[in-house]
Amino acid sequence: MQFRLVASAMNVRAEAMEPPVPQQAPAETCMTAQTRLSRWGRGLARGALIATALAACSPKAATTETTEDAVLDATNDVEVGVDAPADATAADVFDVSGVHPRLMFTKEHKAIIVARQNKPPFDAMWQRLRDQAAATPVAPTPGTWDSGLWSQYAFAAQANAILAWALDDAAAGAKAKQLLLALQDNLEDNDDLDLDIHIPGVLLPYANAWDLLQATPWITADEAKQAQKQLASVTRKFVAKNLDDSFMRMVSFIFTQNNHPLRAASSIGYIALAFPDDPDATRWLDWATDQMDYLLGPKGHYVQSDGGVVEGPFYFSFGFGAVVPFLLALDRNSPADAVHHHTCITRNDVDPWDDNGCVEGEAFTLKNPLRDPTFLSTLDWSIALRRPSGVRAVLNDTHVAVTNGAALLTSLGGANYLLWDWATNAVLPYDTQKFQDLTAWYLGLVADVTPAPPPWRNRFFPAAGHATFRSGWGTDDLWLMLVADHGPARKSLHNHADGASFALSAYGEDLLIDTGYYKPDSMQNPLTTDSPSHNVILVDGVGAPKRGLLNTWGDTDAFLENTHDGEMVAWAEGRIAYEKAEIRRGIAFARKRYFVVADRIQSEVATPRTFQWRAHLWAGFDVGGTYTLAGNRLTIDRQHGGLLIAATTTAGDPTFVEPPFKPLKPPHVHDTDGSGNHAVADATISAVAPGFLVVLAPFKEGATEDDGPLTVTAVTAGAASGAWTIDGATAGTKWRDVAWLRDANAGSTLTLADGHTLETDAAFVLVAESGAYALIAGGTHLTLDGKSLIANNAAPVAVFGP
């Protein structure tokens, strides 16, 4: 069965070829429920209206029969995948040898795990494991099935099973068995609309406990079969409720195409690997491997060709925590040439997924993504988005994020910088619990390799629309990220209208921010979704079109173009058009010391309008630090580092002003690690098409010379142009650079106060007064004091020097 989804701003409907929306509920009720579900993200809609609508639209979701036979009947109501060939057995798909353990660990891991009991950082993980094993979860409340509570049971069972297996601990074995057999399968009593993303915390550790205990003398074959029956029953009921039910399938998996199906598929696929003799194992594994093949492959548009992930680092990492355990278990339990079958019922047929080409039941072999270069490039992307503190960039719907589980891939030969990234995070060092508790996995699956930072600094991801600049990999280094996403890369439920926005950190401080994920109403988009909540240019107070609900994308495309990576200067452009203006935002990173933002604007409107160069400051109100506005300059001071912003335009100097403030309302509200208010300032000017030339000069508080404040001085540039000189020092050697932005009708010569002369036809110039390096954009040549630095250039950007 396939759904054609038609979404509009306030009216979302799903047209099913079969079955139609049940007649028990008026169509309006179902549409209201679907609309109110909003963009499926943090804090799903849970009100009485939703519960009522769900019950009306989906009788199965409201009343589920509780017998095993009834669950099997319900499961068979909807065909998922295809029946296995008559002569097929589970052994044709994966290992059914009965060897234990084989999911999280194999017998070869035992010596490694035991040897790490007193070895940092694993000693702390061992202690965490013992603490989990000592926990005694409360008894479940009759008539409920709480995934959070059963997750506590599952992790306690897993921890005790590891102690029993690794240390021959009989008491731990007895407790693990008790917790394993305690699992109840009354999933029909669960009313959590987020169960699809919470279920990994139950199924994975419980399956590991079952697997490990069977490598000990402390569980009998009959007890293992009883535990398997309960765990398989929970899985079967979960599949019936979330995958087979047409309404829940739509809102959980079809609309989303993101971490929701990835986490759910990883969970039921893991159970299929654990119980290959289960009658539904092949069916479960077909859907699980189909989702890995589709969403993590080229057709699903979730992972872009350069490794960028459409929903950003937060939800990518959230999904990753469940995906990696499944793929690791699949790698050791399924042969590379195993045949699976595509399952199309969770495909979405609207843009950008209307090219999915899914054929129900089509046979395929899965190249495990853990061995696929494109999927592995997501980890380079994630590390490129690493801020100096170690946590990931605030991008799209994001709070504090790290990619927990990436270091495990060193066991498969993954790069040593995956281990470095895990070990050197200043906020969450050696984290094993963010999004999914993988503590036990780290004990056996982190390779003994020497950690080292990546061999690269700046990275550009044009398909994803992300550019990152950094001076190095230390906590005091400079970092900036530019966003310019288009097409499938911006068409995801967690995306924001943030084309051509950027964020900046330096000297141990965040200075210019993305406002994050403030969502006080779970039935609506976050208040921080749209353009005014980002560092963009507003035209008469308006930015890119607002985001829509669900699969009504809104927003507009932006394009990352004309990138250059160099030792002295790096460059990237983000191009976007809205409000009858095309904005080409270029960002130069010079000397690993400062940034220049050069915004070239073309307007279809011949009369002046108000242009606002917006900056979200990590200062003021609830976030500490101070800021000062002084005409066309702005200074931020925080404990360790600060930032000078100096702005001019090709139409004269703008003035920094603050927009009206309303607590916890855009543009001042943020939620990056807790909600609050921050300062916002707009460099404002009225003109037809004022090109902005803005110097971003970070400094270390209290420092002089290299890391102290740079001297940024205005240059008289003539009509239709603006210019700055920037003075600083590197290793005690002083230098001066010139930044110059020109409209097409500007003069071609710039004479500096000290007598140096530049001549160009370029729209933007950044050049060392010494002639050590130069960059031009939108031009053919540049001379300095009559000496040609760049000539006969036909490319959008050209660089002289390293």
What is each model feature region?
Residues 518, 522-801:
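CBM-like, beta-strand-rich accessory domains located in the C-terminal region of large
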